[in-house]
UniProtKB/Swiss-Prot annotation:
This is Uncharacterized protein C02B8.1. Residues 103-112 have a biased composition (Basic and acidic residues). Residues 91-112 are annotated as: Disordered.
Length: 112
């Protein structure tokens, strides 16, 4: 039945009820669209991972997502390299220090 006919037949409280029902329907549609948008993006990414060859990775993500990912990846790589390079440097310094100590200990034992 068309909405105009319903509104003409309805009176006071029934009209309020129809308006409330319309508000609820609009809100539920908006919520469904929001959920659908989120699910569609996630599902399409997952489906495309399995259906496309790995060489087409650029299709799976937006340019912004790839840019953000590459920035994070390069930042992480840089920090890891810094950590390991400083660790190796410290390790080399320790080895040199222990060699000097050992040689001085051997020299002192030989003298005594």
């Amino acid at each position: 039945m068309p909405r105009k006919l319903l509104e003409e037949r309805s009176t006071g409280s029934a009209t309020k009820w129809l308006r409330e029902e319309e508000k609820i329907e609009k809100k539920s549609r908006a919520d469904q669209l929001k959920i659908k948008f989120m699910q569609t993006r996630d599902n399409s990414d997952i489906n495309s991972i399995f259906s496309e060859p790995p060489s087409e990775f650029s299709v799976l993500c937006d340019d912004d997502d790839c840019d953000k990912g590459s920035v994070v990846s390069s930042t992480l790589t840089t920090s890891i390299r810094k950590t390991f390079s400083s660790f190796r440097f410290d390790e080399n310094q320790r080895k040199k220090g222990t060699r000097k100590r050992r040689s001085s200990e051997v020299d002192s034992k030989e003298k005594s």
